[in-house]
Amino acid sequence: MEFIDLAPSAHARGAVQLPGSKSISNRTLLLAALAQGETQIRDLLKSDDTDRMLEALTSLGVTLTRTGENDYHLVGTGGSFPHKEADLFLGNAGTAFRPLTAALAFSGGTYKLHGVPRMHERPIGDLVDALRQVGADITYLGQEGFPPLLIKPAHIAAQGSIKIRGDVSSQFLTALLMALPMTGKETHIELVSELISKPYIEITLRLMAQFGVEVQRDGWERFTVPAASGYVSPGTVYVEGDASSASYFLAAGALGGGPVRVQGVGAKSIQGDVAFADALEAIGVTITKGDNWIEASAPQLPLKAFNRDFNHIPDAAMTLAVVALFCDGPSRLTNIASWRVKETDRIAAMATELRKLGAIVEEGEDWLQVTPVPTLNAQVPIDTYDDHRMAMCFSLATFGGVPVRINDPQCTAKTFPTYFDVFSQVVS
């Protein structure tokens, strides 16, 4: 197994230009593909997840051209993919798999969607159930409720109301919202359970509006996609920096004194994960913001222990689980059940690896409590479970004054292929 050995860190200072947001990148690619007109996409994230979406769109007959290092030109299909038969390998990219499932269910073709073994363990049944309510023909090729899937042509009767759960993954609602304009019918979506990760739905709604579709919502329980609401290209779309990726560098600024500035997200960001900066501020970190940047510094450690609900920022919350090693008492992360159905079971994985470092960790179905210890265990090999965020989070353990070995560091290619190079430039 490949690994990277990280030296102990004492200081962090500098500025980081963030890679593009994964959530915005893959949503924008699909919307541009479904739209009328041609779209220039600037600052797209270069990663495994976006590569899988680009490959899928190409297989579906979308004309796309790379025009710069992170820039693309897409010719929209007007809501109908040219190729009516395709076999799509989507890796472990939930931001590609879920939205494409919905879009292809309305596309009148025969499509097989599959991925890596972990993708076949990630639930999709709630989305499939919702799509079947309007007539979609979707078959499970393995275990009921999970990928891989076979989609066949079907008569879609989208008028009326679709019921869907919101407490497993917000990507199911995102997928429905993005695909329903393809039907041309007014459709209502009703949530039958609490919606998690609401900020990710905000991203979806804002991007849909940018492409000309205004979804009406009644609180977070009911959404209406208007009739005759096809997508129209806005011309050029700029992708924000990834706010989840910002969390590691803001935390480094907190643990290493700082200041560390992230560029590409700021006070005007549409991403909910910028709230990570507020969570840091609440435990004693000095945060300053501009329209397109955030900066973190801290005069001294330890930081304040916390007990906080992270339902709205589950990805960035992982970073705080490692930051908890440097707090002045037990810290508790709650309402994080969605961690269990991500790239790995993140509650179990985080608990296992924090214990290796010496922390006292308790876990429940939807919570994690971390009690720090005076001295971390040195030269601990951290397993990453093919999960990019596990690898990036545990780089912060080096601020405990110990070397840390990260196994399979290349898993960061999912969202941030150059992460460890950039991290090494701001820490010392």
Swiss-Prot record:
Keywords: Amino-acid biosynthesis, Aromatic amino acid biosynthesis, Cytoplasm, Transferase. InterPro entries: Enolpyruvate_Tfrase_dom, Enolpyruvate_Tfrase_sf, EPSP_synthase, EPSP_synthase_CS, RNA3'P_cycl/enolpyr_Trfase_a/b. Its EC number is 2.5.1.19. It catalyses: 3-phosphoshikimate + phosphoenolpyruvate = 5-O-(1-carboxyvinyl)-3-phosphoshikimate + phosphate. One of its GO terms (biological process) is chorismate biosynthetic process. GO terms for molecular function: 3-phosphoshikimate 1-carboxyvinyltransferase activity. It comes from the Bacteria. 3-phosphoshikimate binds at residues 22-23, 27, 169-171, 197, 315, 342. The active site is at 315 (proton acceptor). Belongs to the EPSP synthase family. Monomer. HAMAP family: EPSP_synth (MF_00210). This is 3-phosphoshikimate 1-carboxyvinyltransferase. It comes from Cellvibrio japonicus (strain Ueda107) (Pseudomonas fluorescens subsp. cellulosa).
